[in-house]
Amino acid sequence: KKTKAIMPVHLTGRMCDMNKINALAKKYNLGVIEDAAQSVGSKYMNKRSGSFGDFGCFSAHPLKNLNAIGDSGYLTTNNYKHFKKIKLLSNHGMFNRNIVKHFGHVSRMDVLQAEILNYKLKNLNKIIKSRRYNFKLYARYLNKDNVFFPSEKKYQFNTYHTFVVQVEKRDKLQNYLKLNGVDTAIHY
């Protein structure tokens, strides 16, 4: 009864099953707020991440696929009522110079971050193409018996924010790679 929204998190450039999530949200009259921080450009059923729910939340942190040089992010919605409220809240809650309708705060992106993102947005398809090419190379050379990595389903278009593998002897592989000059990290 207290639940107001579902927040699917599209991790590593791979989208959640949005048909199931949206069906559940519709059944229980819940909002959907997509965490698309790691999935900019990813698609599910030929539709981009951040466009399925009431809101799409994106990060432009320097380590993301579409990044700026500082902390920033952006929000998407296709609902005009939501847009107007968010715009109001992001400008101190001020309707105009003299009327404050809600408590708010400044959350505008600075011009430098916006310009960098605008430039990189024009190159997003190249960035994604490069990441997908790298994934195919890794997958080809690591396609061994005991190395598992997520496959792309026919209705998905993954952008591979990270290349995730699962192996039985993780620590041994990580040490071997380190000795051979290859950095790895254990995520989540």
Question: What spans do the regions from the language model cover?
Answer:
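Active-site phosphate-binding strand-loop segment of PLP-dependent enzymes
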Residues: 1-68, 74-76, 81
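PLP-dependent aminotransferase class I/II
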Residues: 5-9, 14-20, 27, 43, ...
